[in-house]
Amino acid sequence: LEKMDDAEFAEKFQNISVYARVQPEHKTRIVNAWRNAGYVTAMTGDGVNDAPSIKAADIGIGMGITGTDVTKNVADMVLADDNFATIVGAVEEGRRIYDNIRKAIQFLLGSNMSEVLSIFFATILQPVHLLWINLVTDCFPALALGTEKAEPNIMKRKPRDAKAGIFADGMGFDIAYQGLLVTALVMVSYFIGHFMETGEWTITNSAHGTTMAFVTMSMAEIFHSMNMRSQRGSIFKLGSKNRLLFGAAAVSLLATTAVCEIPLLAGAFGFTSVEPAEYLVALLLSVLVIPIVELVKWIQRRSTR
């Protein structure tokens, strides 16, 4: 290493697997070479001589039992049990947390997009309706998505590009088409509700149509939160269950039903009582969000093979 200049070392370092008797400055040089090549680096160590390279790495890992105080202070991660296998568990947990953040963001932005479009294309819902959906219908499922367990293939994925943004890997497209999908279902529900009330297919203000649109949007977003348990995988093949998400969905559904059926709340929101047949139509429309998104996921998986 002493005899190699930087240019020569840059050509050869990727072919070297084992180093012996390296000095602290050599360790830092090795770490920097990998970082300059665009790789995410991790460095473990326990002694004072490891501190410079641990600090230089993207992820500095110190030993909690045998490590010196200097090493622990500069490390990003401290292994409390000095077990290297713990690093794998930490990487898995980090990927799970990042995945869940993306799922919650995608769910909330897709839902908000459908709400905005429902006003942009036609004034189907009023601001107070959208405020209720944002604060009650969307809030609880989004929080529950943050507790989702790691997906089965999470450790088989390639390392994520450190420069990739939160909307990478087609997330922007997913938000757009899912928002448009819910908007389309809500608009269809509005016109069906108006037709069931008047027997006419006309574009006009309709209390029944507005109520059905509200119920459909609320239930569609509740069902869509189930889609977000996995951004690409089928939710029917997940090996785990998110009981908190199911509970949050049930609470949101009960709140939506209450605001439509309790006279005091229904009057404040301008809703009318919904008949069982109308509830059934809203349910059938809103549940379509699951098979349609599953179909798109399947196409996306096929296209990336």
Task: Go through the PLM ranges and name each one.
Residues 1-43, 57, 62-232:
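Membrane-embedded transport module
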Residues 54:
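Basic, alpha-helical nucleic-acid-binding regions used in initiation and control of genome expression
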